[in-house]
Each structure stands twice: as structure tokens, then as C-alpha cells.
Amino acid sequence: NTFYCCELCCNPACAGCY
């Protein structure tokens, strides 16, 4: 499963924030 981060990067593990 691919994890998509939200508008505000709430997860430091998030690679691509948009």
C-alpha cells in the first residue's frame, strides 16, 4: 500500500508532501 501524506506533512516519514 502506498502512503499518501496530507496537505500538512503530519508524518516525518512522508517523502513527498503536496
UniProtKB/Swiss-Prot annotation:
Record keywords: Disulfide bond, Enterotoxin, Secreted, Toxin, Virulence
PROSITE patterns listed in its UniProt record: ENTEROTOXIN_H_STABLE
Keyword Disulfide bond: yes
Main location: secreted
UniProt keyword annotation of RNA-binding present: no
GO molecular function terms attached to this record: toxin activity
UniProt-annotated location(s): Secreted
Function according to Swiss-Prot or TrEMBL: Toxin which activates the particulate form of guanylate cyclase and increases cyclic GMP levels within the host intestinal epithelial cells.
Family from the record: Belongs to the heat-stable enterotoxin family.
The protein's name in its UniProt record: Heat-stable enterotoxin ST-2
Species whose genome carries this gene: Escherichia coli
